[in-house]
Structures are given as C-alpha cells and as structure tokens.
C-alpha cells in the first residue's frame, strides 16, 4: 500500500493510533451510565439515573406534556 518510507510508516502508525483511541472511547462511553428523561404527551420516563433524594425532589413534579388540540 505505502512504500516502506518514513512517511508511509508514520501515516500507518497514526491511523492505528486513531483507531485504538476511537475504540477506547467507545468502550468508555458504553460503560458510563447516562441519565435520560423523556417527557411525551402520554408519560414521563426516567432511565439510567442515580436516584438520590435531591434528584427525586427535582423530578417528582414532572408530568406528561399537555397540549389541547384546536
């Protein structure tokens, strides 16, 4: 693919390093939990959150979105 020159080896090493870092980032992001709150017209969903007393106080008043038609 590349001739055996310093530039070709440097490009190949940079591509390999980029792919390794990209894989490490994907593994790190998939292991970390994400707190997601989805409010629709029908329900409120809380997924992946740490339920501390302060968090419960913040979200206990959430209600589905109401928008009258017409």
Curated annotation (Swiss-Prot):
Cytoplasmic-side segments: 26-70
According to the record, the segments passing through the membrane are 5-25
Parts of the chain on the Lumenal side: 1-4
InterPro entries, from UniProt? Answer: TGBp3
Main localisation, per the record?
host cell
Q: Which cellular compartments is it found in?
A: Host endoplasmic reticulum membrane
Keywords annotated in UniProt = Host endoplasmic reticulum, Host membrane, Membrane, Transmembrane, Transmembrane helix, Transport, Viral movement protein
**Gene Ontology terms, cellular component aspect?**
host cell endoplasmic reticulum membrane; membrane
Any one GO biological process: transport of virus in host, cell to cell
From which domain of life does this come?
A: Viruses
Q: What else is known?
A: TGBp1, TGBp2 and TGBp3 seem to act together for cell-to-cell propagation. TGBp1 is the main movement protein that physically cross the plasmodesma with the viral genome. TGBp2 and TGBp3 would facilitate TGBp1 function.
Family under the similarity heading? Belongs to the Tymovirales TGBp3 protein family.
| Function per UniProt | Plays a role in viral cell-to-cell propagation, by facilitating genome transport to neighboring plant cells through plasmosdesmata. May induce the formation of granular vesicles derived from the Endoplasmic reticulum, which align on actin filaments.
Q: In its UniProt entry, what is this protein called?
A: Movement protein TGBp3
Tell me the organism: Apple stem pitting virus (isolate PA66)
């Amino acid at each position: 693919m590349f001739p055996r020159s310093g530039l070709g080896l440097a490009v190949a090493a940079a591509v390999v390093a980029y792919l390794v870092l990209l894989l490490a980032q994907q593994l790190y992001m998939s292991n970390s939990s994400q707190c997601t709150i989805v409010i629709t017209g029908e329900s409120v969903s809380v997924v992946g959150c740490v339920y501390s007393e302060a968090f419960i106080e913040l979200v206990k008043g959430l209600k589905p979105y109401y928008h009258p038609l017409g």
